[in-house]
UniProtKB/Swiss-Prot annotation:
Organism, scientific name: Photorhabdus laumondii subsp. laumondii (strain DSM 15139 / CIP 105565 / TT01) (Photorhabdus luminescens subsp. laumondii)
Record has Glycoprotein as a keyword: no
Co-factor note (free text): Binds 1 Mg(2+) ion per subunit. The magnesium ion binds only when substrate is bound. Binds 1 Mn(2+) ion per subunit.
Protein name: Isopentenyl-diphosphate Delta-isomerase 2
Entry similarity comment: Belongs to the IPP isomerase type 1 family.
Active site, per annotation: C65, E112
SUPFAM superfamilies reported for this sequence: Nudix
GO cellular component: cytoplasm
Localization (cell): Cytoplasm
Binding site for Mg(2+): C65, E85
Cofactor(s) essential for the protein: Mg(2+); Mn(2+)
Catalytic reactions of this protein: isopentenyl diphosphate = dimethylallyl diphosphate
Pathway info: Isoprenoid biosynthesis; dimethylallyl diphosphate biosynthesis; dimethylallyl diphosphate from isopentenyl diphosphate: step 1/1
Single GO biological process annotation from the record: isopentenyl diphosphate biosynthetic process
Length: 177
């Protein structure tokens, strides 16, 4: 069954709902979240999206991402997806929000009001192979070079977030968790 997601205006006020597939085919602005999980050494947990995902399949991205369902609190949805995709939960802190729009290679359209959460976890995840095909911990100082050397292997939203951060922003995130 197609998930029903929250449509929002440019101020993140709910204005309706629609099916996930319809939203991404028509490019409707909807609520989403991106989670960045760090270990105690400051490494970022990346996941490789499963090859069966209907968009951005097989691409590397942030620790977890998803959408709240209608009636579901944003942070509750973030915790739900972290467990569903990565097999663990941890305290999360919201650090920013932004709107982005991108046309994906398969003619799907991402138009999201994306809320960014950070967390800390120091064990290995137990990935759900229906969602995630691989994971790795990456040193943040090397991450931009990795993305610049092979931009096509990373999701659009992940590149947008990372490229929009200064090293001071990343250091601040580290202090917050």
């Amino acid at each position: 069954m197609d998930e029903i997601l929250v449509l929002v205006d440019k101020h993140d006020n709910p204005i309706g709902s629609a099916g996930k597939a319809d939203i991404h085919q028509k490019g409707m602005l909807h609520r989403a979240f991106s989670i960045f999980v760090f270990d105690n050494k400051g490494n970022l947990l990346l996941q490789k999206r499963a090859a069966t995902k209907y968009h951005s399949a097989g691409l590397w991205t942030n620790s977890c991402c998803g959408h709240p369902r209608v009636g579901e609190a944003l942070e509750a949805a973030a915790h739900r997806r972290l467990g569903e995709e990565m097999g663990f939960d941890c305290p999360l802190k919201k650090v920013s929000s932004f709107i982005y729009h991108a046309i994906l290679p398969n003619n799907l359209i991402e138009y999201e009001y994306d809320h960014v959460f950070i967390g800390r976890f120091d064990k290995e995840p137990i990935i759900n192979l229906d969602e995630v095909s691989d994971y790795k911990w990456v040193n943040l100082l090397k991450l931009r070079a990795l993305i610049n050397n092979a931009p096509d292997v990373y999701t659009v939203w992940f590149k947008k977030i990372i490229n929009g951060l200064s090293y001071q922003d990343i250091e601040e995130w580290q202090r917050l968790i």
